Curated annotation (Swiss-Prot):
UniProt cross-references to InterPro entries, sorted A to Z: Pltvir_coat
Function of the molecule: Required for genome encapsidation. Forms ribonucleoprotein complexes along with TGB1 helicase and viral RNA.
Family: Belongs to the potexvirus capsid protein family.
Protein name: Coat protein
Superkingdom field: Viruses
Polar residues compositional bias, start-end: 1-10
Entry's Gene Ontology cellular component terms: helical viral capsid; ribonucleoprotein complex
Keyword Ribonucleoprotein belongs to the record: yes
Primary localisation category: virion
Lineage start: Viruses, Riboviria, Orthornavirae, Kitrinoviricota, Alsuviricetes
Protein backbone atom coordinates (compact mmCIF):
# COMPACT_ATOMS: atom_id res chain seq x y z
CA UNK A 1 0.00 0.00 0.00
CA UNK A 2 1.44 3.34 -1.09
CA UNK A 3 2.18 5.85 1.59
CA UNK A 4 0.32 9.10 0.96
CA UNK A 5 2.72 11.93 0.15
CA UNK A 6 2.90 14.82 2.51
CA UNK A 7 3.55 18.33 1.27
CA UNK A 8 5.35 20.82 3.41
CA UNK A 9 4.40 24.43 3.17
CA UNK A 10 6.52 27.34 4.25
CA UNK A 11 5.18 28.99 7.35
CA UNK A 12 3.62 32.38 6.81
CA UNK A 13 5.97 35.13 7.87
CA UNK A 14 5.06 36.61 11.18
CA UNK A 15 3.70 40.12 11.14
CA UNK A 16 6.38 42.68 11.85
CA UNK A 17 6.28 44.09 15.35
CA UNK A 18 6.09 47.79 14.47
CA UNK A 19 5.58 48.72 18.11
CA UNK A 20 9.29 48.15 18.76
CA UNK A 21 11.31 51.16 17.50
CA UNK A 22 14.54 49.24 18.11
CA UNK A 23 13.64 46.50 15.63
CA UNK A 24 15.72 46.73 12.46
CA UNK A 25 13.31 47.59 9.61
CA UNK A 26 13.29 45.51 6.45
CA UNK A 27 13.24 47.00 2.97
CA UNK A 28 9.56 46.04 2.73
CA UNK A 29 8.90 47.98 5.92
CA UNK A 30 10.58 51.07 4.46
CA UNK A 31 8.60 50.83 1.22
CA UNK A 32 5.42 51.35 3.23
CA UNK A 33 6.58 54.81 4.30
CA UNK A 34 5.03 57.35 1.94
CA UNK A 35 7.27 60.33 2.61
CA UNK A 36 7.02 63.67 0.84
CA UNK A 37 9.98 66.04 1.03
CA UNK A 38 9.27 69.15 3.08
CA UNK A 39 11.51 71.95 4.30
CA UNK A 40 10.92 75.38 5.76
CA UNK A 41 13.03 76.78 2.90
CA UNK A 42 10.31 75.90 0.36
CA UNK A 43 6.63 76.85 0.38
CA UNK A 44 4.24 73.91 0.63
CA UNK A 45 1.62 72.95 -1.97
CA UNK A 46 -1.07 73.91 0.55
CA UNK A 47 0.43 77.38 0.96
CA UNK A 48 0.64 77.83 -2.80
CA UNK A 49 -3.04 76.83 -3.07
CA UNK A 50 -3.98 79.47 -0.50
CA UNK A 51 -1.93 82.02 -2.40
CA UNK A 52 -3.84 81.15 -5.56
CA UNK A 53 -7.11 81.88 -3.78
CA UNK A 54 -5.79 85.32 -2.80
CA UNK A 55 -4.74 86.00 -6.39
CA UNK A 56 -8.29 85.27 -7.53
CA UNK A 57 -9.68 87.67 -4.93
CA UNK A 58 -7.48 90.37 -6.46
CA UNK A 59 -9.30 89.81 -9.75
CA UNK A 60 -7.07 87.28 -11.46
CA UNK A 61 -8.92 84.78 -13.63
CA UNK A 62 -8.78 81.22 -12.25
CA UNK A 63 -7.10 79.89 -15.39
CA UNK A 64 -4.40 82.55 -15.09
CA UNK A 65 -3.34 81.78 -11.52
CA UNK A 66 -0.58 79.27 -12.28
CA UNK A 67 0.95 81.26 -15.20
CA UNK A 68 0.90 84.37 -12.99
CA UNK A 69 2.91 82.52 -10.34
CA UNK A 70 5.43 81.28 -12.90
CA UNK A 71 5.81 84.81 -14.25
CA UNK A 72 6.20 86.20 -10.73
CA UNK A 73 8.94 83.71 -9.83
CA UNK A 74 10.71 84.45 -13.12
CA UNK A 75 10.60 88.18 -12.32
CA UNK A 76 12.20 87.49 -8.93
CA UNK A 77 15.04 85.68 -10.71
CA UNK A 78 15.96 89.06 -12.23
CA UNK A 79 15.88 91.08 -8.99
CA UNK A 80 16.61 88.38 -6.35
CA UNK A 81 13.98 86.92 -4.01
CA UNK A 82 14.05 89.19 -0.96
CA UNK A 83 11.56 91.30 0.96
CA UNK A 84 13.32 94.45 -0.26
CA UNK A 85 13.07 93.50 -3.94
CA UNK A 86 10.99 95.86 -6.07
CA UNK A 87 9.15 94.15 -8.90
CA UNK A 88 8.21 96.12 -11.98
CA UNK A 89 5.50 95.39 -14.51
CA UNK A 90 2.12 93.71 -14.40
CA UNK A 91 0.97 90.12 -14.56
CA UNK A 92 0.66 89.10 -18.24
CA UNK A 93 -3.01 88.14 -18.20
CA UNK A 94 -4.28 91.27 -16.43
CA UNK A 95 -2.50 94.61 -16.95
CA UNK A 96 -4.49 96.07 -14.06
CA UNK A 97 -2.73 93.82 -11.52
CA UNK A 98 0.92 94.55 -10.78
CA UNK A 99 3.46 91.93 -9.84
CA UNK A 100 4.13 93.93 -6.69
CA UNK A 101 0.45 93.61 -5.70
CA UNK A 102 0.62 89.85 -6.14
CA UNK A 103 3.84 89.67 -4.10
CA UNK A 104 2.19 91.47 -1.18
CA UNK A 105 -0.13 88.49 -0.79
CA UNK A 106 2.81 86.39 0.46
CA UNK A 107 2.61 88.08 3.84
CA UNK A 108 -1.10 87.34 4.21
CA UNK A 109 -0.29 83.63 4.41
CA UNK A 110 3.07 84.19 6.14
CA UNK A 111 5.51 83.01 3.48
CA UNK A 112 8.55 84.85 2.15
CA UNK A 113 9.41 85.67 -1.47
CA UNK A 114 12.27 83.20 -1.23
CA UNK A 115 10.04 80.34 -0.05
CA UNK A 116 7.65 81.06 -2.92
CA UNK A 117 10.46 81.20 -5.47
CA UNK A 118 12.14 78.06 -4.16
CA UNK A 119 8.89 76.18 -4.82
CA UNK A 120 8.95 77.28 -8.47
CA UNK A 121 12.75 77.12 -8.95
CA UNK A 122 12.60 74.23 -11.42
CA UNK A 123 9.92 76.02 -13.44
CA UNK A 124 12.09 79.14 -13.55
CA UNK A 125 15.11 77.07 -14.61
CA UNK A 126 13.16 75.68 -17.56
CA UNK A 127 11.89 79.16 -18.47
CA UNK A 128 15.44 80.51 -18.51
CA UNK A 129 16.79 77.69 -20.64
CA UNK A 130 13.84 77.59 -23.02
CA UNK A 131 13.99 81.34 -23.70
CA UNK A 132 17.81 81.39 -23.62
CA UNK A 133 17.59 84.53 -21.49
CA UNK A 134 19.61 84.41 -18.23
CA UNK A 135 18.72 86.23 -15.00
CA UNK A 136 19.29 89.97 -15.35
CA UNK A 137 21.87 90.14 -12.56
CA UNK A 138 24.10 87.23 -13.56
CA UNK A 139 27.04 89.40 -14.71
CA UNK A 140 26.94 91.50 -11.53
CA UNK A 141 27.55 88.31 -9.56
CA UNK A 142 30.75 87.72 -11.51
CA UNK A 143 29.59 84.42 -12.97
CA UNK A 144 31.40 83.12 -16.06
CA UNK A 145 29.35 83.10 -19.26
CA UNK A 146 28.81 79.33 -19.26
CA UNK A 147 27.29 79.54 -15.75
CA UNK A 148 25.02 82.55 -16.33
CA UNK A 149 21.77 80.59 -16.00
CA UNK A 150 22.71 79.82 -12.37
CA UNK A 151 22.71 83.54 -11.59
CA UNK A 152 19.62 83.74 -9.38
CA UNK A 153 19.60 83.47 -5.62
CA UNK A 154 17.10 80.61 -5.34
CA UNK A 155 19.00 78.44 -7.83
CA UNK A 156 19.50 75.72 -5.21
CA UNK A 157 15.76 75.05 -5.42
CA UNK A 158 16.41 73.47 -8.82
CA UNK A 159 18.05 70.62 -6.89
CA UNK A 160 15.45 70.38 -4.12
CA UNK A 161 13.01 67.44 -4.05
CA UNK A 162 10.58 69.74 -2.22
CA UNK A 163 10.27 72.06 -5.24
CA UNK A 164 7.56 71.61 -7.87
CA UNK A 165 8.65 69.30 -10.70
CA UNK A 166 7.77 70.38 -14.26
CA UNK A 167 5.57 67.81 -16.01
CA UNK A 168 8.29 67.07 -18.58
CA UNK A 169 11.14 67.25 -16.09
CA UNK A 170 14.10 69.61 -16.36
CA UNK A 171 15.25 70.63 -19.82
CA UNK A 172 18.67 69.68 -18.46
CA UNK A 173 20.05 69.36 -14.95
CA UNK A 174 22.49 71.99 -13.70
CA UNK A 175 26.12 71.13 -14.33
CA UNK A 176 28.59 70.66 -11.49
CA UNK A 177 30.34 73.79 -12.70
CA UNK A 178 27.11 75.82 -12.46
CA UNK A 179 26.43 74.49 -8.96
CA UNK A 180 29.93 75.40 -7.81
CA UNK A 181 29.85 78.84 -9.43
CA UNK A 182 26.54 79.67 -7.73
CA UNK A 183 27.86 78.48 -4.37
CA UNK A 184 31.04 80.54 -4.69
CA UNK A 185 29.08 83.66 -5.68
CA UNK A 186 26.64 83.15 -2.80
CA UNK A 187 29.27 82.80 -0.08
CA UNK A 188 31.37 85.57 -1.62
CA UNK A 189 28.42 87.95 -1.38
CA UNK A 190 27.78 86.94 2.23
CA UNK A 191 31.44 87.41 3.13
CA UNK A 192 31.60 90.86 1.56
CA UNK A 193 28.40 91.85 3.32
CA UNK A 194 29.85 90.77 6.64
CA UNK A 195 33.01 92.78 6.02
CA UNK A 196 31.24 95.80 4.55
CA UNK A 197 31.87 97.93 7.62
CA UNK A 198 35.48 96.79 7.98
CA UNK A 199 38.39 98.84 6.67
CA UNK A 200 40.22 95.87 5.22
CA UNK A 201 39.42 92.52 3.67
CA UNK A 202 41.46 89.34 3.94
CA UNK A 203 44.00 89.42 1.08
CA UNK A 204 42.52 86.35 -0.59
CA UNK A 205 39.00 87.83 -0.40
CA UNK A 206 40.03 91.09 -2.08
CA UNK A 207 40.98 89.32 -5.25
CA UNK A 208 38.57 86.40 -5.14
CA UNK A 209 35.79 86.44 -7.70
CA UNK A 210 33.70 83.65 -9.13
CA UNK A 211 35.75 84.07 -12.27
CA UNK A 212 39.00 83.46 -10.43
CA UNK A 213 37.42 80.46 -8.72
CA UNK A 214 36.07 78.68 -11.76
CA UNK A 215 37.45 80.29 -14.92
CA UNK A 216 41.22 79.87 -14.70
CA UNK A 217 42.28 77.58 -17.59
CA UNK A 218 42.97 74.17 -16.11
CA UNK A 219 41.60 70.66 -16.04
CA UNK A 220 37.96 70.16 -14.91
CA UNK A 221 39.16 68.30 -11.81
CA UNK A 222 41.44 71.15 -10.83
CA UNK A 223 38.56 73.60 -11.40
CA UNK A 224 36.49 71.81 -8.78
CA UNK A 225 39.40 71.45 -6.35
CA UNK A 226 40.11 75.19 -6.55
CA UNK A 227 36.43 76.07 -6.20
CA UNK A 228 36.01 73.79 -3.20
CA UNK A 229 38.98 75.38 -1.41
CA UNK A 230 37.76 78.92 -2.06
CA UNK A 231 34.18 78.11 -1.10
CA UNK A 232 35.38 76.53 2.16
CA UNK A 233 37.25 79.74 2.98
CA UNK A 234 34.16 81.80 2.23
CA UNK A 235 32.02 79.63 4.49
CA UNK A 236 34.48 80.17 7.35
CA UNK A 237 34.37 83.94 6.87
CA UNK A 238 30.57 83.87 6.83
CA UNK A 239 30.43 81.70 9.94
CA UNK A 240 28.64 78.96 7.99
Amino acid sequence: MATPSTQTTDPKPANADLSDPNRAPSLEDLKKIKYESTTTAVATPAEIQLLGDLFKKLGLDANSVAPAMWDLARAYADVQASRSAVLSGTTPSNPAITRQALARQFYVINITPRQFCMYFAKVVWNLLLDSNVPPAGWAKQGLPDDCKFAGFDFFEGVLSPAALDPADGLIRPPSQREIQAHSTAKYGALARQRYRMETSFPPWLKSLTVGSAVSTPCTPLKHLQNCNRNTSKLKLVCGL
